[in-house]
C-alpha cells in the first residue's frame, strides 16, 4: 500500500515502511512510498 511519504529513492521508504507495516520493505513509485 502507498503511504503519504515523498521520496526520490527506495531507501527513503524503508524506515517509514518499517514504522507503518513492521517490515522495512518498500519502493519509491511516482515520488511516493509504496510499502510491501
UniProtKB/Swiss-Prot annotation:
It is found in: Secreted. The keyword Glycoprotein does not apply. Pfam families: Toxin_2. Keywords: Ion channel impairing toxin, Neurotoxin, Potassium channel impairing toxin, Secreted, Toxin, Voltage-gated potassium channel impairing toxin. GO terms for molecular function: ion channel inhibitor activity; potassium channel regulator activity; toxin activity. Expressed by the venom gland. GO terms for cellular component: extracellular region. The keyword DNA-binding does not apply. The record marks 27 as: Basic residue of the functional dyad. PROSITE patterns: SCORP_SHORT_TOXIN. Belongs to the short scorpion toxin superfamily. Potassium channel inhibitor family. Alpha-KTx 01 subfamily. Potent selective inhibitor of Kv1/KCNA voltage-gated potassium channels. Has the structural arrangement of an alpha-helix connected to antiparallel beta-sheets by disulfide bonds (CS-alpha/beta). This is Potassium channel toxin alpha-KTx 1.9. It comes from Centruroides limbatus (Bark scorpion).
Amino acid at each position: 500500500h502507498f503511504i503519504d511519504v515523498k521520496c526520490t529513492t527506495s531507501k527513503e521508504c524503508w524506515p517509514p515502511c518499517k514504522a507503518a507495516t513492521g517490515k522495512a520493505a518498500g519502493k519509491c513509485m511516482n515520488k511516493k512510498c509504496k510499502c510491501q
